[in-house]
Curated annotation (Swiss-Prot):
Superkingdom of origin: Bacteria
Family: Belongs to the class-I aminoacyl-tRNA synthetase family. TyrS type 1 subfamily.
HAMAP family, A to Z: Tyr_tRNA_synth_type1 (MF_02006)
PANTHER family recorded: TYROSINE--TRNA LIGASE, MITOCHONDRIAL, TYROSYL-TRNA SYNTHETASE
EC number assigned by the record: 6.1.1.1
Localisation: Cytoplasm
Major subcellular site: cytoplasm
Pfam families assigned: SYY_C-terminal (PF22421), tRNA-synt_1b (PF00579)
Name of this protein: Tyrosine--tRNA ligase
Job description of the protein: Catalyzes the attachment of tyrosine to tRNA(Tyr) in a two-step reaction: tyrosine is first activated by ATP to form Tyr-AMP and then transferred to the acceptor end of tRNA(Tyr).
Amino acid sequence: MSDLLDDLEWRGLVADSTDREALEAHLAQGPVTFYVGFDPTAKSLHIGHLVQLMLVRALQERGHKPLLLVGGATGLIGDPKMTGERHMNDREVVAEWVESIKDQVSKYVDTDGRNAAQIVNNYDWTVKYTALDLLRDVGKHFSVNRMLARDVVARRLESGISYTEFSYVLLQSLDFYELHKRYGCTLQTGAQDQWGNITAGAEFIRKTTGDVVHGLVTPLITKADGTKYGKTESGTVWVDPELTSAYAFHQFFLNAEDSKVIEYLKIFSPRSREEIEDLARKTEEEPWRRAAQHCLADDLTDLVHGVEQRKAAEAAAQAIFGRGELRDLDERTVLSLSDELGAAHHEGGEYPTVVGAMVAAGVVDTKSGGRRAVAEGGAYLNNVKVADPDQRLTDDDFLCGRVALVRRGKKTVGALTR
């Protein structure tokens, strides 16, 4: 296991760690029980969480045992953000999200065998602590000076930070302590913005038990311009297919920038170093083929949505630009297309003409522009060329009875729903 950290670093999964030599020796000694936490701040995990799960998978494949903590307690509080106070969700909502995220994380790890992953909820032990317990047994070991020096707290001091969010570090440190006591957990992993919480937990364990535990954090994934990776114009890219369709998910990764795609492949793809280095050469020599982007999109969509949904997403991408049969697409895929295209909605009454549908869907700006597209042979309804500018849509034109696609030229596509 001596090369484990080297491999994780090559894959870009290590931003920082506690004493590297000590951590490397600890991992080499035998199976290590480690944990990563997921707070239920929404009903679904997103791309950022997948980075953590890739690290979990890599460690588990090397024989280490994962504890996946879903924060039923910490999710009621919220880790402080740079930009302001978090909205506090109702207990019932958080409890529902806990169950949803439990189901999601279990998909990405092995829950059988000697080093089977175990899912835990920090509500189970946190709820047993009284206010006096927390202040006396936990808070006593934390320096307010050091808590104030934390980057996120320092930035929030001027605008204000509640005692609730200020105290979040105590709860996360308590989690590490409880998992160490209950399961022998000696390593906490997380995103780079959790570094302060992780080291605080390690220090708390050292002070209260004398034991040495470890921490390892992954970098925050960004685009070439430095902004957060994992968001589109329509919002966050989720792993829940009800929130982000397989089509939208596949397209998101297919659009990865050339300058970043190899970085993303190393993090998210199970491909070997040799395969990824070969794709790096292809990207440099023939960037227009987008070989690395296709591999990235395929690998991650297979993982999150399954092979069949990935194939459906690819078929949809071909079909909307006239290179496949739209009527072969299933209703789920058709509806995801309309969502991605920002479909206009027909409220009822007589259906519009194709030209009217093109205007409504934003494919052309004006009816005269639509008529011109028809006259030039560049107007399409469900990939069929339109010859008559006064042709009116019918029931049969709505795919799966729901969506009609209009297109101008080769690439400008819109949708109308009913």
